[in-house]
Regions:
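Active-site beta->alpha loop and helix N-cap motifs at the rims of alpha/beta catalytic domains
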Residues: 35-125, 146
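Glycine-enriched alpha-helix->loop->beta-strand junction motifs that scaffold or abut catalytic
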Residues: 77-80, 106-110, 140, 161-169, ...
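Glycine-rich phosphate-binding active-site loops on the catalytic face of alpha/beta enzymes
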Residues: 116-118, 167-178, 233-249
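Histidine/lysine/aspartate-rich catalytic loop segments that bind and position anionic ligands
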Residues: 159-190, 201
Length: 272
């Protein structure tokens, strides 16, 4: 599998995301409960191990006690997957992200980025000082790669024009409005083709490496279509993050690696 240079980190072209591990199914309560029941601590560790065996060397996952515990145990048991830490706020604790950044660096994160809902909310609220503070804090902790996720093209345009980051993590879809709250909304999510096209247009204008995510609309859109769009959009030093629910298919990791190699490994496009 191809590799990309993200800041000072070398990252596999396909990476694994943590939403299924934490029950963020984007497919309703029954599906969420199914993921939570399947992904015990041991099953998550086995999935990370299988990812490494398939050539995936990086995990994009939350900063919370659950994931901290799993990663600590996984690394203590000999695992070596890199972790790009997703920095979140909490309900009633809008400033706690600073603690999670520090905790992630202390635990051993390779990279860190602000959660897409937080980024959407900060940008919509005009809280641009938070972006500058986040960059300064992450840089001070000597993380190898720092960036921001987001579902809104205009937020990514502002980041592109105003911040020095190592990557921008661009969601192909914008399932819910985060202008009033940064937190996850499980009901009424929307997966519109026009949102995907707007983000693809934005991606083409970004010169730093892009992490393409939600390419399958949280499992709500066809897999091959997602990989075809990715293959057309991905630039030479871009990567992709995909959450995988092995409860559906124990071979999902190797199948996704094969599809990524088929559609993306031959891509040698210069940055726009």
């Amino acid at each position: 599998m191809r590799k990309a240079q993200i800041g000072n980190a070398t990252v596999s072209g396909l990476t694994i995301g943590g939403n299924p591990f934490s029950g963020f199914s984007h497919q309703g309560k029954e599906r969420t409960d199914e993921m939570l029941a399947f992904y015990t601590d041991d099953q998550i560790k086995a999935t990370l191990r299988a990812s490494e065996e398939a050539g995936i060397d990086t995990f994009f996952g939350r900063t919370d006690d659950h994931i901290f515990r799993i990663l600590r145990g996984y690394w203590d048991g000999g695992g070596s997957i890199q972790w790009f830490a997703q920095i979140c706020t909490e309900r009633g604790k809008p400033d706690v992200w600073r603690d999670w950044v520090k905790g992630a660096a202390e635990l051993g994160a390779t990279g860190a980025y602000l959660h897409g809902g937080v980024v959407d909310n900060w940008h919509a609220s005009g809280e641009h000082d938070n972006f500058h503070e986040a960059v300064a804090l992450m840089r001070s902790l000597e993380l190898k790669a720092i960036g921001f996720a987001g579902h809104k093209p205009d937020a990514h345009g502002w980041i592109r024009d105003n911040l020095e980051v190592d990557f921008q993590m661009c969601s192909y879809y914008n399932p819910s409005d985060r202008s009033k709250s940064a937190h996850h909304v499980s009901e009424g999510e929307k997966w519109h083709e026009e949102d995907r096209q707007l983000m693809l247009d934005m991606i083409s204008s970004i010169t730093t490496p892009v992490v393409h995510y939600k390419i399958f609309a949280g499992g709500n859109r066809p897999i091959i279509d997602g990989f075809e769009k990715l293959g057309n959009a991905i630039k030479e030093n871009d990567i992709c993050c995909v959450g995988m629910f092995l409860g559906d298919d124990p071979e999902m990791i190797t199948k996704n690696v094969s599809l990524f190699e088929q559609y993306c490994d031959t891509v040698e496009k210069p940055v726009a």
